[in-house]
């Protein structure tokens, strides 16, 4: 379309095919994501039993999948910047779940019934987990609103993506993680 408007002595060539670059980066992201999940499982398995490590590790892919879905619903396209934001947040999305699982194990060790332990592990830690999540979100979010011009257009998706992923991580930790603990970690 552009070639029709331009004079005949002007050439238009494709330098970078953005969808191709994003597809390649998406592949790299999933490789890094797999490595991160394996590292989380390995580290947690050193400290906790296999089932506990598995529940903590499930939180990451669930959070990332829901984050991708929300980004899609909001019309935020997958591009290099949003992928970079997902890589930035990758290690953070399991933290909340690990804390809830650890608290659940403590409660069960104190002879509290499984259902009560699951409920208490989420409700007692809601404020501290929310505060920690909010602190991280508030450290990224100003980038979306304080920058102007081309810089804003380029960078604004990092804080938005990070904020969505951390909010999803918070919800997964408070709702899904205790439920999985109750069903899979009975003594």
Where are these regions (language model features)?
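Hydrophobic transmembrane alpha-helices and their membrane-interface caps
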Residues: 39-46, 50-106, 164
């Amino acid at each position: 379309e552009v070639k029709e408007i331009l004079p005949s002595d002007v050439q238009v060539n494709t330098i970078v095919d953005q969808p191709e670059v994003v597809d390649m980066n998406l592949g790299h992201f999933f490789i890094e994501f797999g490595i991160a999940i394996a590292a989380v499982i390995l580290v947690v398995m050193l400290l906790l039993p296999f089932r506990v490590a598995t529940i903590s590790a499930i939180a990451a892919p669930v959070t990332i999948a829901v984050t991708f879905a929300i980004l899609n619903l909001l019309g935020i396209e997958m591009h290099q910047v949003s992928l970079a934001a997902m890589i930035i947040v990758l290690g953070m999305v399991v933290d909340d779940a690990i804390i809830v699982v650890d608290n659940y194990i403590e409660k069960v060790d104190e002879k509290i019934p499984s259902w009560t332990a699951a409920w208490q592990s989420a409700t007692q830690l809601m404020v501290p987990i929310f505060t920690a999540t909010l602190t991280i979100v508030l450290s990224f979010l100003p980038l979306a609103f304080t920058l102007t011009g081309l810089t804003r257009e380029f960078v604004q998706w990092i804080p938005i993506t990070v904020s969505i992923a951390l909010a999803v991580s918070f919800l997964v930790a408070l709702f899904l993680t205790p439920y999985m603990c109750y069903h899979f970690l009975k003594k």
